[in-house]
Amino acid sequence: MYGIVMFVNRKEELEFLERKWNENKANLIILYGRRRVGKTMLIKKFLENKKIKRASIFC
């Protein structure tokens, strides 16, 4: 499956990020887990339709 990116079963995580995004205050969110489980893809998927000037992502 090289070259194919699958993004499934992340509805709960995306809803959590959306709730935090819509709060009118600063938040620090630490996303952790085993390697190669889709942490970076989750953040990219969440941010793809957001109008932001800058985002810092450390992997």
Curated annotation (Swiss-Prot):
Assigned keywords, A-Z: ATP-binding, Nucleotide-binding
Amino-acid positions noted as binding ATP in the UniProt annotation, renumbered to this chain: G33, R34, R35, R36, V37, G38, K39, T40
Gene3D superfamilies given in the database record: P-loop containing nucleotide triphosphate hydrolases (3.40.50.300)
Protein name stated in the entry: Uncharacterized ATP-binding protein MJ0423
PANTHER family: ATPASE (PTHR34704:SF1)
InterPro entries: ATPase_dom (IPR011579), P-loop_NTPase (IPR027417)
Biological classification of the source: Archaea, Methanobacteriati, Methanobacteriota, Methanomada group, Methanococci
GO molecular-function term, one example from the UniProt record: ATP binding
A Pfam family matched in the record: ATPase_2
Top-level taxon: Archaea
